[in-house]
Amino acid sequence: IVPPDVAQLQMQAAQASGDATAMKRAATALQMSQYYDEARRFSSMVTERSRTLDTPIYVVTGGGPGIMEAGNRGAHEVGGRSIGLNIVLPHEQAPNPYITPELCFQFHYFAMRKMHFVMRSIALVCFPGGFGTLDELFETMTLVQTGKSRARPILLFGRAFWEKLIDFQHLVDSGMISAEDLGLFHYVETAEQAWERLAEHYGFDLSGTVEGDYSDDS
């Protein structure tokens, strides 16, 4: 997922080419670019509002381009620090330039990288993505469902995308999961809705003042 300005340039180039397939791809990229902006806004919001907490919340991403870049960028733009857990791959990916340099870590194994994501997170926020996003989502839900990891907000940005991709109700109807398991995650559409979910779960108000202890690692 690319930034809206990049998506707009791609659309202009596709229109100039007259290639119908290219124009369709560019239109999809332009539509999906809204999530880049929303991830960027959410990261800025978390970084700014958590500054009043005893323990600030730091955005952690996979360190690469797209939505990962947007997450680090949002924190960077408000003068905050953010973490990148990058993965060494043969054809990608270089760390994005918005990660706090001393908080950029390189991993060789996906399993170790994912373990650190789960161990250190107080929430999982998923934007539309591919196999890697799905892997991290289902791993986290499985660990919470089975009691192997503490409960935390699992937020899925973009209900329309996720409901088209995964029919969770079918899993319930087929007896593969319980109806209660649908409560493991919540759909959100905006940065504000996501922050409200975090505030509700951990007991801090919408400005960031905390009433309870959100940093419990039990």
Give the positions of each predicted feature.
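Solvent-exposed alpha-helices and their adjacent loops that cap or buttress functional pockets
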Residues: 50-54, 76, 96-99, 116-120, ...
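Phosphate/pyrophosphate-binding betaalpha-module
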Residues: 60-61, 65-127, 131, 138
